[in-house]
């Protein structure tokens, strides 16, 4: 194979190296006229044509080989064109008539690693081929990488709660419905007597505490500034104060209503009436203070920014006065504890 290649004559360039570098017309003699005039006759030489150079030992990818082949041919064409005169155009025509076979082997591209340009920008490309065009289209969806950590908001995340329904549920838990077993009020089992027993102090404290616990998250929501939602919150607080007043004071005792005593026992120790009354006052006062703090939260979140006299200001003032009246009666022991 090496002997065959060496026996093949080497084709030289049509212009000498000096004329090619200067991009001037060459007489194509040995030496050329230009080199003789410049006193460079000994330096005048013709290099081998690049079109017949040695091929690469290893075959590169189809894209590199095709681009390098075309680049070489266009370079040689430019070098040769710089030395052509008007009478030499026939040689260019004969060279241009030659067919250049470029073989593109797509199998060689399998070893090329795919670099996703969208990945570097923080996007995830969808490599699923399109059914209509057969092209790969990038899907401009934000990735979960450290470059872009912003996630698309879920449509149900903004309105995943219903403050009005929750407020109605809390208000309904304070309702005195004698037809249900879970009511705060208990009716007498004797129908003809038609008497209703007032809920005990422990029942009132338990129900009111659960209602206030469920009300606090609703007060901190932005929906609490809506007037109709704020009125529901005000109704819940008014109902809580109402049950405190009914359970603590004795002025709401009427015909057909009876009080139920509550027995307090600390382990094996039985407390007398005075100890039970003292313990009840302490627990009730503590729960009333908690209700007062919830009322302050309602006043701060439901208030408007205009600084005017809103309806909730009057409602909060009335509820505070009523709550303070219950607290003062407990402290003075004027109310009748159950």
Swiss-Prot record:
Domain of life: Eukaryota
Organism in which the protein naturally occurs: Gibberella fujikuroi (strain CBS 195.34 / IMI 58289 / NRRL A-6831) (Bakanae and foot rot disease fungus)
Protein's cellular compartments: Nucleus
Keyword entries, A-Z: DNA-binding, Metal-binding, Nucleus, Transcription, Transcription regulation, Zinc
Official protein name in the record: Fusarubin cluster-specific transcription factor fsr6
Outcome of gene disruption: Impairs the red pigmentation due to the production of fusarubin. Results in complete down-regulation of the other five FSR genes.
Function of the protein: Transcription factor that regulates the expression of the gene cluster that mediates the biosynthesis of fusarubins, highly pigmented naphthoquinones responsible for the coloration of the fruiting bodies.
Stimuli inducing this protein: Expression is induced in presence of sodium nitrate, and repressed by glutamine.
Lineage: Eukaryota, Fungi, Dikarya, Ascomycota, Pezizomycotina
């Amino acid at each position: 194979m090496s002997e065959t290649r060496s026996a093949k004559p080497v084709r030289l360039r049509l212009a000498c190296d000096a004329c090619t570098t200067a991009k001037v017309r060459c007489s194509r003699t040995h030496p050329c006229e230009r080199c003789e005039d410049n006193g460079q006759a000994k330096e005048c030489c013709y290099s081998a044509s690049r079109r017949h150079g040695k091929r690469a030992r290893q075959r590169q990818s189809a894209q590199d080989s095709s681009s390098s082949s075309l680049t070489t041919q266009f370079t040689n064409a430019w070098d040769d064109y710089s030395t052509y005169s008007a009478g030499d155009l026939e040689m260019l025509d004969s060279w241009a008539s030659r067919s250049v076979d470029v073989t593109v082997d797509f199998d060689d591209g399998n070893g090329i690693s795919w670099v996703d340009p969208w990945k570097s920008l923080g996007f995830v490309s969808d490599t699923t081929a399109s059914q209509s065009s057969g092209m790969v289209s990038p899907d401009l969806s934000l990735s979960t990488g450290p470059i872009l950590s912003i996630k698309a908001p879920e449509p149900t995340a903004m309105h995943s709660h219903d403050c009005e329904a929750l407020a109605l549920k809390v208000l309904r838990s304070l309702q005195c419905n004698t037809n249900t077993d879970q009511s705060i009020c208990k009716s007498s089992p004797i129908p003809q007597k038609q008497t209703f027993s007032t809920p005990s102090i422990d029942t009132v404290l338990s129900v009111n505490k659960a209602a206030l616990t469920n009300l606090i998250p609703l007060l901190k929501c932005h929906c609490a500034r809506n007037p109709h939602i704020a009125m529901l919150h005000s109704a819940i607080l008014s109902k809580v104060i109402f049950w405190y007043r009914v359970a603590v004071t004795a002025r709401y005792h009427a015909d057909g209503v009876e009080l139920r005593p509550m027995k307090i026992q600390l382990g094996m120790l039985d407390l007398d009436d005075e100890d039970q009354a003292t313990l009840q006052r302490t627990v009730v006062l503590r729960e009333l203070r908690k209700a007062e703090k919830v009322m302050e939260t309602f006043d701060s979140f439901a208030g408007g920014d205009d600084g005017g006299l809103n309806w909730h200001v009057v409602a909060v003032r009335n509820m505070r006065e009523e709550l303070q009246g219950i607290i003062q009666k407990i402290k003075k022991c004027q109310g009748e504890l159950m």
